[in-house]
Design a protein with these regions (language model features):
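Class I S-adenosyl-L-methionine-dependent methyltransferase catalytic core
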Residues: 1-219
Length: 219
């Protein structure tokens, strides 16, 4: 689904997914085109919320996803005590207007600075894992100053631009989805081909030998 500000660009969704630890519950309170939700390995429970009815209508019938038409900030506030360490919230809200080229409005449901401030306050109350995407802004930098931050380049309609990804957890030692491991396309391809070679090599072994190796690796 094409969507302004979507995260489907080369190197963008991979960067975000490579920062996601294992989780049982996955929530996108600003669903939009859902590029990350569609690209990542599903969690046991997947929830997408959007205030724009035209967006949620396009998601009607999506399998394995609870799609909700509503206010994502209010949803998180209501679910605050139910979201534990096994949940991951990925927030990709409409970016702060002052950070955009010519302050262009792109969405049917934009957010004021006051709404961004409310979102930041709610996110800091959550006990679960949280990721937040956005252009750099003083508001986000101040509110999330104690969170981990990585920066990456994304292609926009106006050309390449640096984006930020804030997280309230340390660099993950384990990932929810390993398919995009690697810092760039070349490294991802190297790892993918290496994995295929190892799979083929192990698959060619006699049954008992193969099981012995897999058992040793699983320890």
């Amino acid at each position: 689904m094409s969507y302004p500000g979507g995260k489907g660009g080369a190197g963008v969704f991979q960067t975000i997914i490579n920062q996601q630890p294992p989780h049982a519950v996955y929530i996108e309170p600003f669903l939009g085109g859902g590029s990350i939700l569609l690209a990542k390995r599903p969690a046991s429970t997947n929830v997408g919320i959007d205030a724009d009815r035209s967006v949620t209508d396009k998601w009607s019938g999506a399998r394995g996803v609870d799609v909700i038409w509503g206010n994502g900030i209010s949803y998180l506030q209501k679910q605050r005590d139910r979201l534990g360490p096994d949940a991951l919230v990925y927030c990709d809200p409409p970016y702060v207007l002052s950070t955009r080229d010519r302050d262009r409005r792109l969405y049917n449901c934009e957010m004021s600075d006051a709404q961004h401030a409310r979102l930041l306050a709610v996110l800091q109350e959550l006990r679960c894992m949280v990721q937040v995407s956005g252009y750099y802004s003083a508001m986000y930098a101040k509110a999330l100053s104690k969170w981990r931050l990585i920066r990456y380049m994304a292609m926009t309609r106006g050309g390449l631009r640096e984006e930020c990804l804030w997280m309230n957890y340390p660099q993950p030692e384990l990932l929810h989805d390993y398919r995009y491991l690697g810092d760039d396309y070349r490294e991802r391809e190297r790892i993918r081909r290496k994995a295929l070679r190892w799979v083929a090599r192990i698959a060619s072994l006699p049954e008992l030998e193969r099981r012995a190796i897999l058992s040793a690796v699983a320890v």
